[in-house]
Regions:
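Interhelical loop and adjacent transmembrane-helix boundary motif
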Residues: 1-4, 153, 159-205
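Transmembrane alpha-helices
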Residues: 51, 55, 93, 100-103, ...
């Protein structure tokens, strides 16, 4: 029904928004460590991010079931399987590797000597990030956020495995309609949902770039 489709779109948008926000925060921190730090285990972290991108969503979803469906987790209030929380966690985890690789590529173009020079002039860590790294990484950051947002909305593998009862998402609604031979509903949901998501992504790009240009103008 139309109500189920709207509900699925709302849930998917919520998951995608959370994934993009938390994904960019965590992905930025990981990318900074991989690019500029002397952390001894950064090669291991780099390898893990690459492996996470290569693992199929179905495998990740099954892994989340095994991890978060343990009896002892109920006693400590962390039994997330069968709740929307596990979808949030899985969506964020799926978005981080992609965001991280895009930011690593952007940071590779920014020499560490810029940050070192700023530090020698008395700039603190957060000031270096705010005045040097973030402005130069603007395009990469916007691309990473939009890619994570769009990818999370249509993440069929994870959502079909982990979605709780009475909690539909757009990919689940499309898949269920197709399996029930309701091809018209599936096609309509794909077109309407896709157009809606593309519109939101275009609006986000305009807003993020407009804010950056306004700041640069001052």
């Amino acid at each position: 029904s139309a109500g189920s489709m709207v509900s699925g779109i709302k849930h998917s948008l919520g998951l995608a928004g959370i994934s993009a926000v938390f994904g960019i925060l965590i992905g930025f921190c990981v990318a900074y460590v991989l690019t500029y730090s002397r952390f001894k285990l950064k090669k291991l972290i780099d390898m893990l991010t690459l492996v996470a991108m290569a693992v199929p969503g179905v495998v990740l979803g099954i892994g989340y079931i095994f991890v978060w469906n343990q009896k002892w987790l109920t006693k400590v209030g962390l039994h997330l399987y069968g709740t929307p929380s596990i979808l949030v966690l899985a969506s964020v985890a799926a978005a981080i590797p992609m965001i991280n690789r895009m930011l690593v590529g952007g940071m590779a173009k920014i020499p560490g000597s810029l940050l070192t020079a700023a530090q020698m002039q008395g700039a603190g860590f957060f000031r270096k990030i705010r005045t040097i790294l973030l402005p130069l990484l603007h395009n990469s950051s916007v691309s990473a956020v939009l890619a994570a947002f769009g990818g999370s909305v249509f993440n069929l593998a994870i959502t079909t495995i982990l979605y709780p009862p009475n909690y539909s998402t757009l990919p689940v609604y499309i898949s269920d309609s197709y399996n029930d031979l309701k091809f018209g509903y599936a096609a309509a949901a794909t077109m309407v949902g896709g157009a809606f998501i593309v519109g939101i992504m275009m609006l986000l790009e305009v807003v993020l770039n407009a804010g950056y240009r306004k700041k640069q103008g001052h």
